[in-house]
Amino acid sequence: MFKTYSKSFACILFCIFNIFVVSASAIDLDEATRTVVTDSSGNTTVLTPEQVKRGKRLFNATCGACHTGGITKTNPNVGLDPEALSLATPRRDNISALVDYLKNPTTYDGLESIAEIHPSIKSADIYPRMRSLTDEDLYSIAGHIMLQPKIVAEKWGGGKIYF
């Protein structure tokens, strides 16, 4: 009988612990942190907490295999860090540019389409995970990419010394 009560008590304690710890460990980012550049004119927007969560989930599911931690496994010289995004042609350091890239990816110099070798909406028949993504999904993914340098700083795109 003691075993039954002790197991029940342990289970209840575990559940109570999870309620408080899990809710406290959810990332609560302030508006300043969630503010990201939306276009090449420098306009900004504040991502909602839902967009932040959705962007992270979608990025991990569709992009994370090759871009864990903001690196590019197939080309370590080109990452998703702010400097690399700003030096690309066209610049990809804002949400609308990243959404455009996710629809029609080009080489770093912008001269050739790489839709056949890089997942995109244009190549959804080759990369099925891209098939069901909406514009809002792409916006959330781009928001995640823009937000990460503010959260993990130099680790984002920092390479294998961090990840």
Curated annotation (Swiss-Prot):
Membrane topology classification: Peripheral membrane protein
Annotated keywords: Chloroplast, Electron transport, Heme, Iron, Membrane, Metal-binding, Photosynthesis, Photosystem II, Plastid, Signal, Thylakoid, Transport
Main location: plastid
Annotated residues for binding of heme c: C63, C66, H67, M130
Cited InterPro entries: Cyt_c-like_dom, Cyt_c-like_dom_sf, Cytochrom_C550, PsbV_cyt_c550, PsbV_cyt_c550-like
Example GO molecular function: iron ion binding
Keyword hit for Plastid: yes
Location within or outside the cell: Plastid, Chloroplast thylakoid membrane
Cofactor: heme c
GO cellular component: chloroplast thylakoid membrane; photosystem II
Signal peptide range: 1-26
A single BP term in Gene Ontology: photosynthesis, light reaction
Taxonomic superkingdom: Eukaryota
Cofactor note (record): Binds 1 heme c group covalently per subunit.
Pfam family, one: Cytochrom_C550
Function: One of the extrinsic, lumenal subunits of photosystem II (PSII). PSII is a light-driven water plastoquinone oxidoreductase, using light energy to abstract electrons from H(2)O, generating a proton gradient subsequently used for ATP formation. The extrinsic proteins stabilize the structure of photosystem II oxygen-evolving complex (OEC), the ion environment of oxygen evolution and protect the OEC against heat-induced inactivation.
Similarity comment text for this entry: Belongs to the cytochrome c family. PsbV subfamily.
Record's subunit section: PSII is composed of 1 copy each of membrane proteins PsbA, PsbB, PsbC, PsbD, PsbE, PsbF, PsbH, PsbI, PsbJ, PsbK, PsbL, PsbM, PsbT, PsbY, PsbZ, Psb30/Ycf12, at least 3 peripheral proteins of the oxygen-evolving complex and a large number of cofactors. It forms dimeric complexes.
Name under which the protein is recorded: Photosystem II extrinsic protein V
The species this protein was found in: Thalassiosira pseudonana (Marine diatom)
Record lineage: Eukaryota, Sar, Stramenopiles, Ochrophyta, Bacillariophyta
